[in-house]
């Protein structure tokens, strides 16, 4: 396929138009008084949203050179979303301001490489200043404030605060669609997985169709259990101990299963058999996790542990086990707190090391189960469109809350960025020439989010920016009430991780655009067919 090539100012100018088109579509949503954007879908009804990354993902421009710029800024939004889960609109607005001011300087003769280096140094300085100014968040009300600001909904904020408090730092909070109109929270304590009893004869509570074992022993086996002579010695020891038994193995079948069922019917031994979840290495890893949680060992002939030879010492324990036809929950396993903490540390290291999003998600699920908490927020709404929008808001709120717990919070409403300009004072002495110009470009861009928050609220953005830059740290403009005041006290806060990700990702993409000298795109097919020359020009 033939290519079209543009050089120098023409290429950069076209990319800037693309950056502006995407950013202008996204920035109308910024702040508590931001507007909505309606997205037409090729199927189904339109989507109404104020989520920056959702809007950015929908945008592809007709002009291929402009589209290059739009796609670069889209990457700012998606990368910020991947790292912090929120702050995508802030990142997009910052990137636009940096590209606009930077390109003006490049057109006036500044060296793009030095300019980019100045922008990078300024971004690092501001990022460190934000981290230093952070206030830690660990209580329910602090988490709820962050979630409320992110979702613009107090009820969602409260639910997310409650969910995060109940499941702890390593717990998992998932968001699902509810079949009712209400938005509710469900918390599962203990370690749960989606496999139920192998036979309905194991049920102990016929009303709820559950098998409930109190003060139970737990047998974990890596392979199938089918031979009765292998299982019988252990069953006799368990019967002597007078405790119920939970068996989790690859499968339980044949004589072994029928013996367990007969004992359950006669009530001579309370036992429940469950298939281990997952496959292959994931199953092995999960059984090892359960061994740590229950304080037992996994029966595994490979390491010399054979079922017919083991005693009660290899069994784990649990205060309570509840098994239904398709789920199992182990509450208060007997594993030592130290062993669980070590295992959690190992999982965190694996999460840090992995490049695969899928692996990371599965490792985080395992970590949450170890920590003993999974919360599900079920989102309900009156219409399909409303449900999508509300679910998106809850997902953003959960991400923001997690980010806040991780690195703390700073003043929201764009004020922290305006006030972080002070961090650039110490930098100015160590840079010169076009690098110093890059620092000033970054300095001017830091006010862009606040400018648009105020503009979207119907005020003069420049006036608000000037006023906020004179206020002490912690104070700023509350666009919800249209008043200046103590934003931390009012609960107008942003997670530091979100703000830092926005700053660093915007700087990175701005550097790419500024240092672009040539743009190459595919020639549209119909133009090739006609054999016409193509002139690509952009009015300045």
Curated annotation (Swiss-Prot):
Summary of the function given for this chain in its UniProt record: Together with its co-chaperonin GroES, plays an essential role in assisting protein folding. The GroEL-GroES system forms a nano-cage that allows encapsulation of the non-native substrate proteins and provides a physical environment optimized to promote and accelerate protein folding.
Family to which the UniProt record says this protein belongs: Belongs to the chaperonin (HSP60) family.
Key words, A-Z: ATP-binding, Chaperone, Cytoplasm, Isomerase, Nucleotide-binding
Protein name, entry field: Chaperonin GroEL 1
The enzyme's E.C. designation: 5.6.1.7
Molecular function terms, GO-annotated: ATP binding; ATP-dependent protein folding chaperone; isomerase activity; unfolded protein binding
Enzyme's top EC category: isomerase
Annotated binding of ATP, by residue: 29-32, 86-90, 413, 478-480, 494
Cellular component, GO annotation: cytoplasm
Record's catalysed reaction(s): ATP + H2O + a folded polypeptide = ADP + phosphate + an unfolded polypeptide
Location in or out of the cell: Cytoplasm
GO biological process: protein refolding
Assembly with partners or alone: Forms a cylinder of 14 subunits composed of two heptameric rings stacked back-to-back. Interacts with the co-chaperonin GroES.
